[in-house]
Structure formats: structure tokens, C-alpha cells
Amino acid sequence: MNARAAAVAELERRIGYVFTDRDLLERALTHASVGDGARAVRHNERLEFLGDRVLNLCAAERLMALDPDAREGEMSRLLASLVNYHACARAAKRAGLQEALRLSASATKVGARKSDAVLGDACEALIAALYIDGGLETARAFFLKFWDEEFARLDEPRAKDPKTQLQEWVQGMGLPLPTYEIVSQEGPPHAPSFTVEVQVAGFGAERGEGRSRQAAEKAAAQCMLLKREGPEPGKVGE
């Protein structure tokens, strides 16, 4: 048994489920970068689409069961914390999916195996494969097992993110809301790098970088927040 076959076996052991359709499992674990150029390789992108919907269903029904009196807005906020690609990537690592992935040599070289975006997508594809091969109960069992820590994180006190802090600050100053603009987007699709510029009236502009647009916006907002102890609006440069 080679290293990857051992990793796939370990993945199934951790999940507690052995696939009947081995081709389906292989497709769920195959990144779009795989292919020799001579023929199409069935990869996991279509499965991601289905897996995202199954994941949202499992998370939504669990949230409703945990708090029957929760308002829709609060559940939507909690749902967003449970189904983003960072949460999916953490679940993928807990399951041992990282080493079981099929990646091209070039994708492996640039670190795709450690990419939250790649791992998150693969996790959604795996959920879809579990749903197809074993039904909703099998997919739900995976979710409950590997999202347990994510539910624990919901109870942790959370500091406001930089974008929220910046918005509250400018509103308190009576200024227009900050504006964000993508300055550049570089790198391959599985490992992009964004640069975003934020502007606040009277305080100029600041830039931030990140692996996603949202991360870059937060970085830019954090840089702008450092100007709060600077000159008042309209006095910049005086």
C-alpha cells in the first residue's frame, strides 16, 4: 500500500465509513489541477456544489435543534461561522483529508495541500460523496463528528473584526462609510493573493493584503484603524 492509499484508508477509518463506490470517493478527493492534458479527469468541483447545500442543511437543522427559540438573524450569523471555508478546512484536517487529496505536482509545489480554500472545497466534495454513497444520515454523522469543535467556538467571546470597528468609528465621527476597492489579484486560482485599498474621508487610503478579498479588506481596515489617533478629518497634512 502506497502512502496515498494509506492516507485514504486512514480517512475512512476516522470517518467511520467505507465507501461502496470507490470511484466516487476518488473523485471527491481529486483536485481540478489533476490531469495529463490528454484526457479529462473527473475532479471534485461539481461535488463541491452539492456538498455545500448538504452542509448548510446539516448545520441549519443542528442550530435549530440547539436553540428552538433563536431568531432567524442570529441563526444566519451562526450559520455563516459554521459553513465558511476556514471551518471546512479545519474539519478536513481533523478528518485526515489533507494527505488523501489528489493534487497535480505544480499545485502541490505551491502549497495547495495546505490551502484552506482547497481543503474547504475538498471537504464539501467529501460531504457530497458521503450523501450520495450513504445517504443523508451518513453525511450528517460526518458533520456532527467533525464540526463539534466549530460549535464549541460559537460560545467563545469574539472581538469585533476590523471592518466592523472601522465602520463604527467613522459613523461615530459623522463620516461617510469606508469604501473598499480591489487594487490587484495575483496568483493561481487555488492560492490567490488580493490587495485591497480602503478610503475614509479626511484620512486618505490604506492598503491590505490577504488570501481572500475579505481577508485583504480586514487587513486594510486594520491599517486604517491605526490612524485613529492621528489628526482630525480636514486637518490631514496641516
From Swiss-Prot:
Reactions the enzyme catalyzes: Endonucleolytic cleavage to 5'-phosphomonoester
SUPFAM superfamilies named among the record's database cross-references: dsRNA-binding domain-like (SSF54768), RNase III domain-like (SSF69065)
Principal subcellular localization: cytoplasm
Residues annotated as binding Mg(2+): 48, 121, 124
Keywords: Cytoplasm, Endonuclease, Hydrolase, Magnesium, Metal-binding, mRNA processing, Nuclease, RNA-binding, rRNA processing, rRNA-binding, tRNA processing
Annotated PROSITE patterns: DS_RBD, RNASE_3_1, RNASE_3_2
UniProt-listed CDD domains: DSRM_RNAse_III_family, RIBOc
Gene Ontology CC terms, in alphabetical order: cytoplasm
Signal peptide as annotated in the record: none
Cystine pairs: none
Domain DRBM: 161-230
Pfam families linked: dsrm, Ribonucleas_3_3
UniProt-annotated location(s): Cytoplasm
Required cofactor(s): Mg(2+)
Active site: residue positions: 52, 124
EC numbers on record: 3.1.26.3
Subunit text: Homodimer.
Annotated PANTHER family: RIBONUCLEASE 3, RIBONUCLEASE III
Function according to Swiss-Prot or TrEMBL: Digests double-stranded RNA. Involved in the processing of primary rRNA transcript to yield the immediate precursors to the large and small rRNAs (23S and 16S). Processes some mRNAs, and tRNAs when they are encoded in the rRNA operon. Processes pre-crRNA and tracrRNA of type II CRISPR loci if present in the organism.
Protein's name according to its UniProt entry: Ribonuclease 3
